[in-house]
Regions:
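Helix-biased "structured C-terminal domain" signature
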Residues: 1-478
């Protein structure tokens, strides 16, 4: 049910994409171009902008949202399955409120009221879970995050006295008990007690808690920073023992009513191909990334690099020089991994899977014989290396030592090659020396192309996508 909109000659937004309300949000200054909305997966500029139909909640009208806009701003926020559409919508809206209210609390450094002990005692299972955490040495604070009964949101915050770190977990649901239970279970979801040693320390630095990247960290795994003000004894709201519960239909109506009271419009897509599921977008409320990213940090920047990077082994010297120059001029963070940059899934246990922009530029400079530029990046790699492939670290240690000799006027590689080989091994030194003299190109990177040879992980994704399309076509009688 996707619809494609051809690009216009002047690159303005094509008619039929978005509505007036959303255009005001996503294109307030008229700077958003059609080319900004080419989807990253297909990269099909000739076909245009891939868009998905959503139903506007207020009047049932269909509005087309570019898939690029959704992937750039909303990530997975507001998606859920359920036994029926009403139940799925309750879960979608609960998730949206959880994250939006959490963001508001963290960014505005709002002080929440504690949940009274007599209220907590109504839920012995939850109290037992809290006591279990405290017995492990983690003080727990339970707070009402409804902002005076406005929203169905709770918060359970864990402190780690061993590290000084704090982990604030939020949960949302029309039922007070379910929201509280979700807040508690979220604390340890996907992490062990040892994992709680990595949670960040609170701060009085308002800039640190309010920057957009901090919210992204909270969205991904709740490891963003929160303010010390969060723990003030002077709370900004009184405790409310709220209750929005009812039938699925009643809960859905209540949650949509909250959005309406905020002046927000919701857009809904329902899916029944593999069970009952839906997605809800609430523009200017449920985005994870800032709207400016559509212009300044769009994922479709991958289209500027994908083909050249996948064809790396077949590029001429001029093409390599052009590629590395474009990477430098892009001012992209050196530590962005290539998986993220070009939108291709590699096996994470391979060199491709852990390759960053920094290492790619380093290998290109070696291939071009620019040893000084390569040396600078080798030093950066060794200083900030997160690569878990041990052999890769040793390769660059050996490369650093060998480049120091190669770039010196006083040293000769023949005087050191024996010792280097004893230290790093024959295979590694053959790769290092070969990379420096041009006999070895892009050491560790297996050759591939736009046909994705050898990239089984991405090919499996494509195969799954084809199966889904086949099933949907069969269901539609096509």
């Amino acid at each position: 049910n996707e619809k494609w909109f051809a690009l216009t000659d002047d690159d303005s937004l094509p008619e039929g994409i978005l509505d007036d309300y959303t255009r005001e949000i996503y294109n307030p200054e008229g700077e958003l171009c059609g080319s900004h909305l080419i989807d990253t997966n297909s990269g099909n500029k000739e076909r245009g902008i891939c868009s998905i139909p959503y139903v506007r909640h207020s009047d049932g009208e269909t509005v087309y949202f570019p898939s690029n806009l959704i992937e750039n701003l909303f990530l997975s926020n507001g998606m859920s399955a359920g036994n029926n559409f009403a139940e799925a919508k309750v879960q979608c809206l609960s998730e949206i409120f959880e994250r939006a209210v959490k963001r508001q609390i963290i960014e505005q450094e709002i002080v929440l009221p504690d949940v009274p002990e007599d209220v907590l005692n109504k839920y012995p299972g939850i109290v037992a879970g809290i006591n279990g955490l405290e017995e492990q040495g983690f003080p727990v604070v339970v707070k009402d995050a409804s902002l005076g009964g406005q929203f169905p949101v709770m918060c359970v915050t864990l402190m780690n006295p061993k590290t000084g770190g704090v982990f604030a977990s939020f949960g949302a649901h029309p039922s007070f008990e379910v929201a509280l239970e979700r807040s508690l279970t979220e604390l340890l979801q996907g992490r062990s007690f040892e994992g709680l040693n990595d949670v960040p320390k609170p701060t009085f630095n308002s800039m640190a808690v309010s920057e957009p990247e901090n919210f992204v960290e909270h969205f991904i795994d709740s490891t963003g920073v929160i303010s010390w003000r969060f723990f003030s004894a002077k709370h900004d709201y009184d405790f409310v023992e709220w209750d929005f519960s009812g039938s699925n239909e009643e809960e859905t109506a209540s949650l949509f009513g909250i959005l309406e009271s905020l002046g927000k419009e919701a857009y809904i897509a329902e899916f029944s191909d593999l069970g009952t599921a839906c997605r809800i977008l609430v523009p200017d409320y449920s985005e994870v990334y800032p709207v400016e990213d559509l212009i300044w940090d769009n994922t479709n920047k991958a289209l500027n690099f994908r083909e050249d990077i996948l064809n790396l082994h077949r590029l001429s010297e001029d093409q390599l020089a052009d590629l590395v120059e474009r990477l430098e001029q892009s001012e992209l963070d050196n530590y962005i991994d290539i998986i993220t940059l070009i939108g291709i899934e590699f096996d994470e246990n391979t060199v491709w899977g852990q390759l960053t922009i920094l290492e790619l530029k380093l290998l290109i400079y070696l291939a071009l014989g620019d040893l000084e530029a390569a040396m600078e990046l080798v030093e950066a790699f060794l200083q900030y290396n997160d690569n878990t492939i041990v052999e890769r670290g040793l390769f660059y240690q050996a490369m650093h030592a060998t480049l120091e000799v190669a770039l010196s006027d006083d040293l000769e590689i023949e005087d050191y090659i024996h010792s280097f080989t004893r230290m790093f091994g024959q295979e590694t030194m053959d790769a290092v020396v070969g990379s420096i003299n041009g006999d070895v190109m892009f050491y560790g990177l297996t050759e591939t192309s736009m046909k994705l040879e050898g990239l089984d992980r991405h090919l499996r994704l494509i195969e799954s996508y084809k199966k889904l399309h086949t099933a949907r076509a069969k269901k539609a009688g096509l």
